[in-house]
C-alpha cells in the first residue's frame, strides 16, 4: 500500500529492521556478487539501469556465471512504478527466478525491492552503483507514476538480504551523486528534531534517540570529509574519505531508518521533496533526491527553532554545488501551485495544523 499523507493512515511495522542481512563494501566487490546470490538461489532476475550495467564492465555477469547462477536480464531505464514492478514480478515467477538482483541507482534499488515484494517476497541482493541515497539499504521503495510524480512509499516487513557495493565503481561516478547523498544523509539529524530545538532521551523513544545519536555522528563526519570525498571522486580516486562517505550515505543512513522503525528519521525536508515531485513534476525531473531534500531542510531548520542555522547550512550547500532554493530548480515562486504545496506541507503528518505552526512555516 502506498504511504498516505495522514499519519493515522500510515501503517508502520512494529519490528525494528536494523539493516541488510549482509553488507559488502570494498574494491572489487563485484567479484563476490555471484557467491552472495548463490546463497539465495540458482536463478536470478537482474534488473539493471543501462548505464549502471555498463559500469560493471562485465564483472557482475562473470561473477554470476562463475558461481553457477543463471539469470534473466532486464535493462530498465524508467521510473520505479507499481505497474513495472508487477510486470517484473511476473517475469521472475514465469521464468523460475528464485532471487531478485538490482544493479543501479536509487530507482533501480527500489524497483528490485518492489519486484521481490510482488513476486511473493523473493530474496533481494542490491548492487548500488551510486551513493546518492540509502535506497539499497532501506526496507521501503519510493514509488512514482510513469511521469515521475511521487506516490509515496511502499514499506516492507523485512530487510534486503545482501548489498554488494563495489568501490571501484563508486569512485568513478559523477561527484554530484555523492554530494546529493551527503545532503540526504545530513538531513537525518535535522529532520529527526522536527519542531524541537534539541533531542533529549526523556522526550523521545530510545529508538529515535539512537537514530538521532547516530545521525549526529554522521553529520559531523560529513562536515569534516564531504568536500575531500567529492574531490577524490571527481579525480576517480578511492580514498578513506570516499570509503567513509559511501558507508555513511548507504549503510549508516539505512541504519538510522531502521532503528527508528522507518518513521521519525524524515520530516519536512523529505516531505518537501515528495510534494515538489508531485506538484512540480517536470521542473523537478533534472534534480536528484538529496538536492531537493536539502532545500526543504532549510525550512526544517527554521521550524526546529534554529533560523540562525539556515545561512551556514546554505553556505555548505553552496560549497557542494547544490541548488539553494525552489527557484533555483526552476519553480516559479508565484505559481498558484505553491499554495497547494504549502497547504499539503502544513497538513502533512509532520506537523499539527495550528496557527502557531502556520506562522512558523
Segments (PLM) and residue ranges:
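C-terminal charged capping/lid subdomain of soluble metabolic enzymes
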Residues: 2-10, 198, 306-361
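ATP/NTP phosphate-donor binding region
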Residues: 2-99, 326
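A glycine/threonine-rich phosphate-anchoring loop and its flanking beta-alpha core
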Residues: 21, 118-212
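Short glycine/serine/threonine-rich phosphate/pyrophosphate-binding segments
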Residues: 30, 53-57, 107-114, 133-137, ...
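Generic secondary-structure signature for well-ordered alpha-helical cores
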Residues: 38, 65, 69, 93, ...
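A short, small-residue-rich loop immediately preceding and capping a beta-strand
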Residues: 92-130
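Active-site segments that bind and position negatively charged phosphate/pyrophosphate groups
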Residues: 203-316
Amino acid at each position: 500500500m502506498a504511504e498516505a499523507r495522514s499519519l493515522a493512515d500510515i501503517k508502520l511495522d512494529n519490528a525494528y529492521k536494523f539493516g541488510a542481512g549482509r553488507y559488502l563494501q570494498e574494491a572489487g566487490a563485484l567479484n563476490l556478487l555471484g557467491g552472495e546470490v548463490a546463497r539465495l538461489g540458482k536463478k536470478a532476475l537482474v534488473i539493471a539501469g543501462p548505464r549502471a550495467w555498463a559500469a560493471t564492465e562485465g564483472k557482475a555477469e562473470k561473477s554470476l556465471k562463475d558461481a553457477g547462477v543463471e539469470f534473466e536480464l532486464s535493462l530498465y531505464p524508467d521510473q520505479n512504478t507499481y505497474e513495472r514492478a508487477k510486470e517484473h514480478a511476473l517475469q521472475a515467477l514465469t521464468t523460475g527466478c528464485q532471487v531478485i538482483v538490482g544493479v543501479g541507482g536509487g530507482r533501480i534499488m527500489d524497483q528490485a525491492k518492489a519486484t521481490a515484494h510482488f513476486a511473493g517476497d523473493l530474496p533481494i541482493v542490491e548492487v548500488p552503483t551510486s551513493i546518492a541515497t540509502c535506497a539499497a539499504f532501506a526496507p521501503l521503495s519510493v514509488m512514482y507514476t510513469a511521469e515521475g510524480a511521487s506516490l509515496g512509499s511502499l514499506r516492507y516487513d523485512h530487510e534486503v538480504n545482501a548489498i554488494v557495493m563495489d568501490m571501484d565503481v563508486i569512485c568513478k561516478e559523477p561527484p554530484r551523486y555523492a554530494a546529493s547523498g551527503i545532503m540526504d544523509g545530513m538531513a537525518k539529524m535535522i529532520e529527526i528534531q522536527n519542531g524541537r530545538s534539541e533531542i533529549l532521551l526523556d522526550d523521545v523513544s530510545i529508538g529515535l534517540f539512537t537514530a538521532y545519536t547516530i545521525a549526529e555522528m554522521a553529520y559531523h563526519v560529513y562536515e569534516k570529509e564531504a568536500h575531500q570525498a567529492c574531490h577524490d571522486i571527481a579525480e576517480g580516486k578511492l580514498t578513506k574519505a570516499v570509503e567513509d562517505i559511501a558507508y555513511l550515505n548507504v549503510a549508516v543512513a539505512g541504519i538510522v531508518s531502521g532503528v527508528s522503525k522507518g518513521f521519525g528519521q524524515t520530516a519536512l525536508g523529505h516531505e518537501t521533496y515528495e510534494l515538489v515531485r508531485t506538484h512540480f513534476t517536470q521542473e523537478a525531473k533534472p534534480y536528484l533526491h538529496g538536492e531537493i531534500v536539502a532545500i526543504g531542510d532549510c525550512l526544517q531548520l527554521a521550524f526546529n527553532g534554529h533560523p540562525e542555522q539556515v545561512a551556514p547550512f546554505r553556505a555548505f550547500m553552496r560549497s557542494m554545488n547544490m541548488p539553494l532554493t525552489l527557484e533555483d530548480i526552476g519553480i516559479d515562486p508565484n505559481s498558484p501551485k505553491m499554495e497547494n504545496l504549502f497547504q499539503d506541507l502544513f497538513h502533512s503528518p509532520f506537523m499539527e495544523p495550528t496557527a502557531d505552526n502556520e506562522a512558523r512555516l
